[in-house]
Amino acid sequence: MARQLPPGYSLHEGYPPAETYCNLRKNAGLSVRSLEQAQVVPSGSWYGCMISYTPPPTSTNQQNENASEEQTEIVAMGRIIGDGGWYFVIADMAVSPNHQRKGLGDHVLKALIEKIRSSPVVAGVLKSGGPKPYVNLLADEPGRKLYEKNGFVYTAPHSLGMMLEWD
């Protein structure tokens, strides 16, 4: 049985607004990105999801019907870059520090994996026993246990991740 999100948290499909995306990356310890870079994330992605948090009502904010909507914040995100057929890259896995250690990253990752698994091409290939899709990510130290727990394995020594070092 799937674990439920803690009270006040909700999973949504889509991408955070560019400013929220940048702040969440920065606050979670990922590399800083510009607003211009963040604005093209939705068009350059295959799928994304995020988790929002709304604090429980208190006597103060119950007076104002819009209080909970105003207090809702996006606290976790992740996305998939891919072709929809066989090649997928998990990216931008981030959880706000104040909301870590609650299983939110696990919920985001499981939602991303399930989206890949349930896509028509992948589902058909998995059912027929055809070549499996290639799903990869770059695993920074804080996320490695999470990724291993969800079935990811190190590719070394067969292959190693590399990046272009810009001048």
Stretches found by the model and what they are:
Residues 38-57, 64-69, 74-94:
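A conserved beta-strand-loop-helix scaffold within acyl/acetyltransferase catalytic domains
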Residues 54-71, 114, 118-130:
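Intrinsically disordered, low-complexity domain-flanking/linker segments in eukaryotic proteins
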Residues 1-8, 58-69, 167:
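Eukaryotic N-terminal low-complexity, Ser/Thr- and Lys/Arg-rich leader segments
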Residues 1-36:
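Short amphipathic alpha-helix that is part of the acyltransferase structural core
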Residues 99, 103-111:
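Conserved acetyl-CoA pyrophosphate-binding loop and the N-cap/start of the following alpha-helix
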Residues 96, 100, 140:
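Residue-level recognition of the GNAT/N-acetyltransferase active site
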Residues 120-167:
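Conserved active-site alpha-helix within GNAT-family acetyltransferase domains
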